[in-house]
């Protein structure tokens, strides 16, 4: 119950027997002291909600679509990871040369070990790709990328002369092949 006050244009509100000064624009939206659900119900038992309120949750499909796109993008990042390493491996292969020393051998070992390790843990990678709709294509791209990395390591081993590709590598009594051309530089004196 409200009554007008003598000064300030405010209103007095009696709530539970105590009078408090209220501003003119204040509106009391609750019924009584308590704010429980039963007090907010009307006399018919209906809940008094504002106009346009609905008890049913509104599904937000834009969030689900954005999540699905994010999962697809993440799965493609995982699948394309080995292919993204190939240009850097080619550059390192070029810079290390074909001589047999500690740096090129370590580089070849790491280049061969990474794809083998990735292929051995492929089941864990496929668990990441299960939520994707293009799971098989992404798995195939992942497999091809790792096989290309292994092929680069094998090629580097062959160019360094570490692979046994001639029969003299296996048998001691066979002479190694002679090189047909020998190139050299410098001035002849």
UniProtKB/Swiss-Prot annotation:
UniProt keyword annotation of DNA damage present: no
Biased composition range(s): Basic and acidic residues: 36-46
This protein's GO CC annotations: EMC complex; endoplasmic reticulum membrane; membrane
InterPro entries according to UniProt: TMEM85/Emc4 (IPR009445)
Superkingdom to which the source organism belongs: Eukaryota
Lumenal side: 94-104, 155-189
Compartmental location: Endoplasmic reticulum membrane
UniProt xrefs under Pfam families: EMC4
Disordered: region residues: 1-20, 30-63
Keywords attached to this entry: Endoplasmic reticulum, Membrane, Transmembrane, Transmembrane helix
Transmembrane portions of the chain: 73-93, 105-126, 134-154
Cytoplasmic side: 1-72, 127-133
Subunit structure: Component of the ER membrane protein complex (EMC).
Family classification: Belongs to the EMC4 family.
Function as written in the Swiss-Prot or TrEMBL entry: Part of the endoplasmic reticulum membrane protein complex (EMC) that enables the energy-independent insertion into endoplasmic reticulum membranes of newly synthesized membrane proteins. Preferentially accommodates proteins with transmembrane domains that are weakly hydrophobic or contain destabilizing features such as charged and aromatic residues. Involved in the cotranslational insertion of multi-pass membrane proteins in which stop-transfer membrane-anchor sequences become ER membrane spanning helices.
UniProt protein name: ER membrane protein complex subunit 4
């Amino acid at each position: 119950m409200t009554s007008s006050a003598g000064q300030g244009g405010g209103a007095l509100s009696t709530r539970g027997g105590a009078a408090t000064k209220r501003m003119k624009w204040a509106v009391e939206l609750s019924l009584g002291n308590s704010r429980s659900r039963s007090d907010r119900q009307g006399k018919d038992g209906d809940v008094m909600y504002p106009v346009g309120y609905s008890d049913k949750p509104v599904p937000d499909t834009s969030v689900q679509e954005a999540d699905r796109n994010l999962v697809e993008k993440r799965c493609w990042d995982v699948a394309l990871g080995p292919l993204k390493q190939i240009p850097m491996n080619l550059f390192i292969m070029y810079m290390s040369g074909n001589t047999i020393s500690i740096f090129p051998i370590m580089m070849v070992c790491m280049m061969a070990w990474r794809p083998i390790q990735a292929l051995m843990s492929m089941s864990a990678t496929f668990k990441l790709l299960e939520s994707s709709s293009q799971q098989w294509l992404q798995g195939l791209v992942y497999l091809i990328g790792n096989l290309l990395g292994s092929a680069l390591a094998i090629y580097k081993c062959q160019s360094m002369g570490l692979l046994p590709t001639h029969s003299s590598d296996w048998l001691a009594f066979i002479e190694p092949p002679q090189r047909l051309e020998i190139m050299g530089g410098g001035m002849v004196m």
